[in-house]
Design a protein with these regions (language model features):
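Coiled-coil dimerization/phosphotransfer module
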Residues: 1-181
């Protein structure tokens, strides 16, 4: 468990540094998703279809960071386990909710079977995805069956997202916390 926590902390630092390469006040959902997908496609040679809403929602830095990791972790799971031809990331806003689906047309699995694994034995990726969704007030559920692919479904409330000024302040507080400025 300690190794997984250390890995998460290291990943948080890497993500924050990557995000700060550009103007940190301009960090937005669409470029983050496209960047993750482009890196994934380059490293995996697996095509990923991306569907985004017409209007880009403004998200708190913490929500954006966790959502970036969720998409990244779900795609890594696709690459490791799905044995698929294609994957997708679909994002839409509806009824003050951000809906994110990361899916594939792969081999699938029985989610009930995964839920029965002892803590720490396997499934850290799915557990991390669930925890990150909960940390930003969201929910996660997995839709899968053997032979039918997998869908990781995330719902995050939009009503609690701060405006840009508070979002930027929260981002800098996170940087100061991570790097001790």
């Amino acid at each position: 468990h300690v190794a997984a926590m250390a890995s998460d902390i290291h990943a948080d630092i890497r993500w924050t540094v990557r995000a700060l390469r550009d103007d940190p006040t301009q960090i937005r959902l669409f470029p983050v998703v496209h960047g993750i997908v482009e890196r994934f496609e380059r490293n995996s040679n697996l095509p990923v279809n991306v569907r985004l809403p017409a209007v880009e929602p403004t998200l708190a830095f913490d929500t954006l960071r966790h959502l970036g990791y969720i998409v990244e972790e779900a795609l890594v799971n696709v690459w490791k386990h799905a044995d698929c031809r294609t994957a997708w990331v679909a994002i839409e806003t509806q009824n003050e909710q951000l809906h994110v689906v990361i899916g594939d047309d792969g081999v699938g699995f029985d989610p009930a079977e995964v839920a029965e694994w002892p803590v720490g034995s396997k499934g850290w990726g799915l557990e991390n995805i669930r925890e990150r969704a909960q940390q930003v007030g969201g929910q996660c559920h997995i839709e899968s069956a053997p032979g039918e692919g997998t869908r990781v479904v995330i719902q995050i409330p939009l009503r609690d997202q701060p405006d840009d000024a508070r979002r930027n302040q929260a981002m800098w507080e996170e940087v100061w916390r991570l790097f001790g400025f």
